[in-house]
């Protein structure tokens, strides 16, 4: 699997299929990614992004999926703890400690609860935590799904900061950790290099700092 961090919380997984998670980037567009499946963790503008204009098969929590359907998006709803299969891609929705509202004057309001995703494709398991605070059941995500990669927010203020994300990484146990949702704006500035150094000094986990548009290959483990 080829993993590309497009910026903020937006990640493209490329294997036999292409999965785009949280299709928002602060500059430019994700239109050229041409995903087979879009996953949206919650309704905030910096995560739902271009989901409406892409109009690709999309998975989100039920309330948000219904909003997207009303906008002409072929969206499928699910809920936390559930798993669906789409064209050989297994998607499990996990909890996240965050809010979820739709930034649309015509449809403002609750968009269900925020979530994360475990994605399994081509023998690789990726956990995208979405926007979240630290919670102890991250240990169960590690025990149940054994992710190869954990994508964790570190920006603080609206999500975990680096201190909490260090604990989350150890709870989950993924050998590869990639920080997301930081340094997009001043309010979520974070020291990613310090985060990497602290984790790699105290654990056997590896932290990879990708720049926007940079990629890495994740070999199959199953």
UniProtKB/Swiss-Prot annotation:
Family: Belongs to the UPF0173 family.
Pfam families in alphabetical order: Lactamase_B_3 (PF13483)
Domain of life of the native organism: Archaea
Database matches in InterPro entries: Metallo-B-lactamas, RibonucZ/Hydroxyglut_hydro, UPF0173, UPF0173_UPF0282_UlaG_hydrolase
Protein name: UPF0173 metal-dependent hydrolase Mboo_0816
Matches recorded under PANTHER family: UPF0173 METAL-DEPENDENT HYDROLASE MJ1163 (PTHR43546:SF3), UPF0173 METAL-DEPENDENT HYDROLASE MJ1163-RELATED (PTHR43546)
Keywords: Hydrolase
Membrane-spanning residues: none
GO molecular function, one term: hydrolase activity
Source organism of this protein record: Methanoregula boonei (strain DSM 21154 / JCM 14090 / 6A8)
């Amino acid at each position: 699997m080829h993993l590309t961090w497009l910026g903020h919380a937006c990640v493209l997984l490329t294997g036999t299929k292409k999965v785009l998670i949280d299709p928002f980037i602060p500059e430019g567009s994700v239109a050229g990614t041409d995903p087979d499946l879009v996953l949206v963790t919650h309704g905030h503008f910096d995560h739902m992004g271009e989901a409406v204009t892409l109009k690709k098969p999309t998975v989100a929590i039920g309330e948000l999926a219904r909003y997207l359907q009303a906008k002409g998006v072929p969206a499928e709803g699910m809920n936390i703890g559930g798993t669906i299969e789409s064209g050989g891609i297994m998607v499990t929705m996990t909890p996240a400690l965050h809010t979820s509202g739709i930034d649309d004057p015509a449809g403002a309001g609750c968009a269900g609860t925020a979530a994360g995703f475990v994605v399994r494709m081509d023998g690789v398991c990726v956990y995208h935590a979405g926007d979240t605070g630290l919670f102890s059941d991250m240990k169960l995500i590690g025990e149940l799904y054994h992710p190869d990669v954990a994508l964790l927010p570190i920006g603080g203020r609206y999500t975990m900061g680096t201190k909490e994300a260090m604990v989350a990484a150890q709870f989950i146990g993924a050998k590869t950790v990639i920080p997301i949702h930081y340094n997009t704006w001043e309010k979520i500035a974070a020291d990613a290099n310090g985060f990497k150094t602290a984790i790699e000094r105290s654990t056997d986990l590896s932290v990879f700092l990708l720049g926007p548009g940079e990629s890495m290959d994740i070999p199959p483990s199953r």
